[in-house]
């Protein structure tokens, strides 16, 4: 018996430094992760520090729109 919108939604996290480097064509790709967040606990955009295989280091991954 779901009421309206679900509380937990699927979000896509994208590497912020790869996005900046992609404009200059320095990066071979853009790292993306798929995760879930609780809409009530975190109404703002999610930012997590995750490993980027293209930058070879841990970077900030921010939530993007679908």
From Swiss-Prot:
GO molecular function (one): structural constituent of ribosome
Keywords for this protein: Chloroplast, Plastid, Ribonucleoprotein, Ribosomal protein
One GO CC term on file: chloroplast
Protein location: Plastid, Chloroplast
One of the GO BP terms on file: translation
InterPro entries associated with the record: Ribosomal_bL33 (IPR001705), Ribosomal_bL33_CS (IPR018264), Ribosomal_bL33_sf (IPR038584), Ribosomal_zn-bd (IPR011332)
Domain of life: Eukaryota
NCBIfam families to which the protein is assigned, alphabetical: PRK00504.1, PRK00595.1, rpmG_bact
Family: Belongs to the bacterial ribosomal protein bL33 family.
Name of protein: Large ribosomal subunit protein bL33c
Organism: Nandina domestica
Gene: rpl33
């Amino acid at each position: 018996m779901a009421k309206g919108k679900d509380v937990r939604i699927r979000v896509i996290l994208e590497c912020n430094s790869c996005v900046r480097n992609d404009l200059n064509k320095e990066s071979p790709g853009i790292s993306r992760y798929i995760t879930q967040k609780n809409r009530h606990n975190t109404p703002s955009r999610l930012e997590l520090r995750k490993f980027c295989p293209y930058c070879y280091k841990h970077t900030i991954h921010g939530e993007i729109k679908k």
